[in-house]
Amino acid sequence: MSDKRRAIEGCLIGTAVGDALGLAGEGLSRRRQARLFPDLSRPHFLGRQGMVSDDTEHTCLVAQALIASAGELEALTRALAWRLRFWLLGGPAGIGWATLRATVKLWLGVPPDRSGVWSAGNGPAMRSALLGVCY
């Protein structure tokens, strides 16, 4: 297995595991999180199984779009926008307001390069790690 493939797999697995471990404490103060979840070595959301958020789902969509586009920027943009549109149809739980607005704009025909919205959220940063590994 190549080093790049190992790095890509590690990024995807690390994103999912970190997301599953941290999801139950999202939005909680450090003190409240420590009181509710003293053992951070396992997932707490949905029992022992854990659950990932839209951050992991979108990282997987980025991976799919990278593969479909062979890394060509315009094709990547179209492939990711297409995937986001159909992801929204699944009725994702806990979707952020900015993600919802941007994806609805895609459905309304706004081009991907103009569908973004201003937000203080960290979603794009969470989903961009794979791009750093690939490029």
Where are these regions (language model features)?
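Structured, active/binding-site neighborhoods that engage oxygen-rich ligands
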Residues: 1-135
